[in-house]
Amino acid sequence: YDDLALRTAGTAVFDIYFINSSSVDPDLTFAYGRPSDVPVAGDWDGDGVDSLGVQRGATFFLRNELSGGAADAPFTFGRAGDIALTGDFDGDGADSIAVVRDGKTFVKNTLVGGGADSVLVFGRATDTRVVGDFFGTGIDTLAIVR
């Protein structure tokens, strides 16, 4: 099951609610990143458990634990202002980052800096991209919402 992570607006505080918990209070609370960072979630190390990270400009700071602390995988990819997507785009069992800019989606299959492994021209620049394993293959793909 997926759990729910909420970040309090204007802060860097994350509240984690475990779906199988009967509590109405957060099961876990911690601070990570800066209030202006954009949160991202994924299974960065392929252990089957999603954790959090943040996007700050074109730099991603990813953690493999649901806790504060130093990033396990900081790297720069894309440009400031890009919209981040996460998913297992190559089917290796670990999530990575894609960024959307001007109607193009730039996919990086590893958590290291550098150029995109693939560039997808799909939909219109104004479309919203969503990620999922829509075919049940273990590989995430894109869909658009218009």
Question: What are the residue ranges of the model-derived segments?
Answer:
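Trp/Gly-enriched beta-strand/coil motifs that build multi-repeat beta-propeller-like domains
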Residues: 1-146
